[in-house]
Amino acid sequence: MSVSARIILSVLRAVKKAGLRKGRGTDVEAEIRKARACSRRHPYREPRGGKASYLTLHAGKYPCLLMKREKNRLTDKAILYLHGGGDRDVWKPEVSFARRYGERAGMDVFYPLYPPFTEASPEEAADLVFRVYRGIVKRYGAGAVSVIGGSYGGLLGLQLLSRINGHNAAGERDPVPMPALMILNSPFAYPKTEEKWALAERLEAEDPILPVGAFRYMLEMTRKAAPDTPDSLLYPADMDFRGAPETWVFYADEACSAVAEAIRQSYARDGVPDRLHMHIEPGMMHCCASAPCSGKADGILTGR
C-alpha cells in the first residue's frame, strides 16, 4: 500500500475512534427516507469525456452503461462490473474504476445501474443483473465474460452465480453458462450465525470505513423495505455455487470479512473448493484490491 493510502487509512481510523464519524440512526424508516433522498440527488447522467466511448443501454426501466474500447465496434471480451452501494444509488464513483479495468484488459465494460434495496426489492436488482449478464453472454460467449463486483456489488456477484444455477435447475430451454472468471473485492453479505454476527461487530469496531452497527442496520433496512427478501439473496450459506467459475475474493481485515468463512464453506459444500481463491490482507482497507495503488485485481484479470 502506498504512503498516501496509509495516511488516509490512519486518518479514517483516528476519526472513527474519536467518535467524529457517526453511524446510522435507530429509526429505520427515517434512514430509508435519507437513502432515497441521497439517490434522488445522484440521478444517472451518461459520462462525458474522451477516456472511453460511452453508450447508455436499457435493461427494462434501468440504464446500463457500456464503456467501449473502440468507438465504432465492440471487442471480443467483456466485463460485467457491479458497483457498490446497496441502500442508496452511488453509481458514479466507480465508473473510473470500471473504465480502468476495461482499458488494462482490452475489454468492453457493462455497468448496470441496479436499484438500491430502498427503492426496489433485492430480487429485482438480482434479476436485472442476471438479465444483463445473459445478454452479454449471448453477444460475447460465456468464455469471454468476466464479472467484477465490489462491496455490495460483490454480493450481487455471488447472487448471480446462485441465480444462474436456479435458472438452469428450473429446466429452462435456454440454459445460461457460468462466466469465465469472477473477481470480488470486499464482497458484502450478512452473517448467518450469532458467532459470525459477533465477529462482524468486533471487526466493525476497528474498520475504518464501515460504521459500528452497519451490518445490523443494513439488514434491518432490507427487511423493512423488502420484507419478502429470501435468505438466498442475503446469506452466502444459503446460496448455490455449484459449477462456479474461478473466483478471486479479496478482503482487508475488515467487517465484511466476517462472511469469508461462510463463502469458503459454501464453495466446499457445492463441490468447487478449488475454484475459490480467497485473500485477506491485514492492514489494508475496504475494496483495497480494486484501488489504483494495488493492481491485484487487474493482475488477475489480465493474467499478469
Which residue ranges define each predicted feature?
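Short, surface-exposed "cap/lid" segments of acyl-processing enzymes
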Residues: 71-101
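Alpha/beta hydrolase fold serine-hydrolase catalytic domain that processes acyl esters and thioesters
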Residues: 3-44, 77, 137-142, 159-304
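Short beta-strand immediately N-terminal to the catalytic nucleophile in serine-hydrolase-like folds
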Residues: 147-149, 185
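Gly/Ala-rich beta-loop-alpha elbow adjacent to hydrolase catalytic centers
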Residues: 149, 153, 157
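Catalytic nucleophile-loop/oxyanion-hole region of alpha/beta-hydrolase
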Residues: 91, 110-144
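A fold-wide structural signal in alpha/beta-hydrolase
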Residues: 78, 106-110
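Alpha/beta-hydrolase active-site loop signature
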Residues: 86, 114-118, 189, 285
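N-terminal cap/lid segment of alpha/beta-hydrolase-fold proteins
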Residues: 31-71
